Amino acid sequence: MKIVREALAGTQESSDLMVKIAPADGELEIVIHSEVIKQFGDQIRQVVNETLHALAVRQGLIIVEDKGALDCVIRARLQSAVLRAAEEQPIDWSKMS
């Protein structure tokens, strides 16, 4: 999916996260800020990468402000933000699990 506009999803509340997406030329840039980065940073990055790969996002700036969200919340917030920021196109719902 091509990112064409800025979008937000999520909150700054405990056990949630805020995802900010913006269009950018070049490669995909992912920035993760988390209160639990030392314990779960690798897992958070893996979930973010897998979700973006499943949605075929190859360019853009993705900023994740995590407050201890579970993997399912990370996926849901990323999916919401990407769909808000992407070009209008048919969605393959089978890729969103």
Swiss-Prot record:
The keyword Acyltransferase does not apply. Keywords: Cytoplasm, Phosphoprotein. Its main location: cytoplasm. It is found in: Cytoplasm. Signal peptide: none annotated. GO terms for cellular component: cytoplasm. The modification O-(phosphoribosyl dephospho-coenzyme A)serine is found at S14. Covalent carrier of the coenzyme of citrate lyase. Belongs to the CitD family. HAMAP family: CitD. Oligomer with a subunit composition of (alpha,beta,gamma)6. This is Citrate lyase acyl carrier protein. It comes from Enterobacter sp. (strain 638). The lineage of its organism: Bacteria, Pseudomonadati, Pseudomonadota, Gammaproteobacteria, Enterobacterales.
